[in-house]
Amino acid sequence: MNNSPQRAAKGFTRAFWVSNTVELFERMAYYAVFIVLTIYLSSILGFNDFEASMISGLFSGGLYLLPIFSGAYADKIGFRKSMIIAFSLLSIGYLGLGVLPTLLEAAGLVSYGVTTQFNGLPDSYTRWIIVPVLFVLMVGGSFIKSIISASVAKETTEATRARGYSIFYMMVNVGAFTGKTIIDPLRNVIGEQAYIYINYFSGAMTIVALLAVILLYKSTHT
């Protein structure tokens, strides 16, 4: 007898499909931004190459370190609450990456267009506001790394697990490929401003994922 809340196509639960769908959105959001993060830091915020590489490297390292702690916390509060926390933080972080340049431009430190014109931003400490914004993204992303694959494991049986993980990794790859391909056509149309607006795309993806979890994710395993 199946004790899952609702079995979907081919023996998978609704929670399984929701987990995989939000993973698709999260990967699209992540790769759309991460692939140009170093360029964003240098071309939009005025960091030199060393500073931009250092910040980007610390961000990447944190994404692999923090799941040790966030994964343990996720076990205590359950997958659904963890995903809500994760996508809330990711939405705040991505939108923060988009809003920050607007605030810097309003302060007269930079002018954005097809190319970026700095008016003192490289010498201003204000640009370092990016660090807490990236930290929010890092924490949100660390939850995702630990909970989505675990949710897939919980929502499959021995008979469906191999097929379930095949679907999961397909979603990861499709999301990564799609996210990486968005920036070039956007940059061809609006120039360096693309590095700003891509963050709103990623924010929209994580907001959709957040709503999907809130409205659709129900599981007896968490």
Q: PLM features: what roles do these ranges have?
A:
Residues D49-F50, E158-F168:
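Loop-to-transmembrane helix entry/capping segments in MFS-fold secondary transporters
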Residues S88-Y125:
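C-terminal ends and interior cores of transmembrane alpha-helices
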Residues M1-R14, E158-A162, I183-T222:
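Intracellular loop-helix junctions on the cytosolic face of multi-pass helical membrane proteins
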Residues G57-A72:
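Central cavity-lining transmembrane alpha-helices of secondary-active solute carriers
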Residues I35-E51, N188:
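Short amphipathic helix-loop junctions that connect adjacent transmembrane helices
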